[in-house]
């Protein structure tokens, strides 16, 4: 089922102690990441799983005032989370890229909420995760809740 809302409203679906997966590489859902970080003072113990979180200086949830709000589990330690992990507020998870979908599916890495980017749905309701679909498909399949801003730069799947 598709529901449209604002990023701030969608971020309210994230609860304390949830496990949140954030799509990486060139498809980081920046508007959702910011909306989640903006709720940092309301949240506690949110486990943030990310891979290839490149392209920014530091993730907005990696701030001292959020040290009790967000614990980072990085599947690839990139510049946006490196200092946060070095300060002890997160951990690196050593895994081959091809093994990670199995970790999601077996529940070893649980996903309550997946923050992804997607294309506009086609006539049949299908979306594309674009060029960063490496872990997005398995994350979407395993998450209890999927939140994705509709990206008009992602190609829409033909019907």
Which residue stretches match the model-derived regions?
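N-terminal active-site beta-alpha-beta segment that forms phosphate/nucleotide-binding
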Residues: 1-79
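A broadly conserved detector of short glycine/acidic/proline-rich loop/turn motifs that flank catalytic sites
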Residues: 26, 52, 76, 96, ...
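Short, acidic Gly/Pro/Ser/Thr-rich loop/turn segments
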Residues: 55-56, 121-123, 155
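Hydrophobic alpha-helical hairpins/lids featuring a short glycine-rich hinge
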Residues: 84-147, 151
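Conserved small/polar residues in nucleotide/adenosyl-binding loops
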Residues: 153-159
């Amino acid at each position: 089922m598709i529901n449209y809302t604002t990023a701030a409203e969608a971020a309210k679906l994230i609860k304390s102690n949830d496990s949140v997966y954030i799509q990486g590489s060139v498809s980081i859902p920046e508007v959702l990441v910011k909306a989640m970080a903006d709720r940092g003072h309301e949240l506690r113990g949110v486990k943030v799983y990310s891979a290839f979180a490149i392209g920014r200086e530091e993730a907005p949830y990696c701030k001292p005032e959020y040290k009790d709000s967000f614990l980072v589990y990085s599947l690839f330690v990139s510049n946006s989370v490196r200092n946060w992990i070095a300060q002890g507020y997160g951990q690196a998870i050593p895994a081959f890229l091809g093994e990670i979908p199995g970790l999601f599916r077996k529940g070893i890495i649980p996903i309550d909420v997946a923050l992804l980017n997607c294309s506009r749905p086609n006539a049949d309701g299908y979306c594309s995760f674009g060029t960063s679909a490496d872990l997005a498909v398995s994350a979407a399949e395993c998450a209890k809740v999927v939140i994705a801003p509709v990206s008009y730069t992602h190609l829409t799947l033909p019907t």
